[in-house]
Amino acid sequence: MTKVLLVDDDEMGCDMLSRRLVRRGFEVIVAVDGKQAIEAARREKPEIILMDMSLPVMDGWEATKCIKSDDATRGASVIGLSARTLSGDREKATAAGCDDYDIKPIEFDRLVGKIERILGLAKIQVR
């Protein structure tokens, strides 16, 4: 089962996305800020991290840089998520170490397609 670390401080949105990911066959771990994301990435060793970029304590940009610079966590793929649509954010995400970037509100099937592409999976089975 593919392990996903979902990092978002929006409790309702996080819960909804988490439930949908579980129904698609993912194991989901949740963190609510950048510091928790780094700790969870070290502890849980997820294959993919869905990282909101606007977070308390430590933002997603900085957390992604830390995760990608740590030997213990750099193998995890990161998809940056943001409600912001500012010019240059996609490039900023790439510079931070994100493997892809998506805009909120999340279009679930598109997000799963990005996950499958990044992980090289042909299809994630529904449980």
Please annotate each region the language model reported:
Residues 44-50, 55:
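Active-site beta3 strand of CheY-like receiver
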Residues 30, 55-58, 87:
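Residue-level signal for the "D+5" position in two-component response regulator receiver
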Residues 94, 106-115:
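C-terminal output helix
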Residues 25-32, 40:
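Short hydrophobic/Thr-rich beta-strand motif most characteristic of the beta2 strand and flanking loop
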Residues 15-23:
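Charged docking surfaces used in two-component/phosphorelay signaling
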